[in-house]
Amino acid sequence: MSGHSKWSTIKHKKGAADAKRGKVFTKIIKEIMVAARMGGGAIDANPRLRAAVLAAKAENMPKENIERAIKKGTGELEGVAYEEMNYEGYGPGGVAVLVDIMTDNRNRAASDIRHIFSRNGGNLGEAGCVAWMFSKKGSIVFNKDKVSEDELMEIALDAGADDVKDEDDQFEVITSLEEFVNVRAAFDARELAYEVAEITMVPQTTVRVEDEKLAQQLLRLMDGLEDSDDVQNAYANFDIPDEILDRIA
């Protein structure tokens, strides 16, 4: 399969663990603060903020935490001023890696990301070296054993989805940024349970990784990036076969 949707499912399951819940909350709070700072605190008038609040609710974040983060973003409450950056590079096997950073210390973030890449067989590249390989899309992932393909296709296409991909044990619904909220709402209205629903960077091409040791090193790189306090999201264009991914993830 394409790898990124499978990795998203694995990543979200890991993020649901109690040990990492605090880190997940922290990343969402930072996104809410920045979204409110950039586009205002009115959820209905700020698509980025609306998406961040929906993500917070999906993680069962308390309402007061969400409201406090919005107020910190708009300046009603004192809060940290985060800076957004992107890093690009290559992982083991020539896999393209794109990293979204949100930090209050640019130098610390740069040093940390460089160290994570080098420690796990990767290297940072110049700005623009891999970003062109990805497109920002909505992604909604379903387990095949929990949905009817016919019903899924009908809802997705009627709601304005771009594509439905059949990937081994999963279906992945791809949407434009503009239609993501509408498509997800259509699935919610019909009570179709999805594994992941997110705005992500979808790779236009993928790199097949069939060597298990190389795949392990690649996932260690991705885990290291996701665990960094300054990293909001990390994307890669790997294509690891399910049988290998299930063994090592």
UniProtKB/Swiss-Prot annotation:
GO terms for cellular component: cytosol. SUPFAM superfamilies: YebC-like. GO terms for biological process: regulation of DNA-templated transcription. Its main location: cytoplasm. Belongs to the TACO1 family. Keywords: Cytoplasm, DNA-binding, Transcription, Transcription regulation. NCBIfam families: PRK00110.1, PRK12378.1, YebC/PmpR family DNA-binding transcriptional regulator. This is Probable transcriptional regulatory protein Sfum_0996. GO terms for molecular function: DNA binding. It is found in: Cytoplasm. Pfam families: TACO1_YebC_N, Transcrip_reg. It comes from Syntrophobacter fumaroxidans (strain DSM 10017 / MPOB).
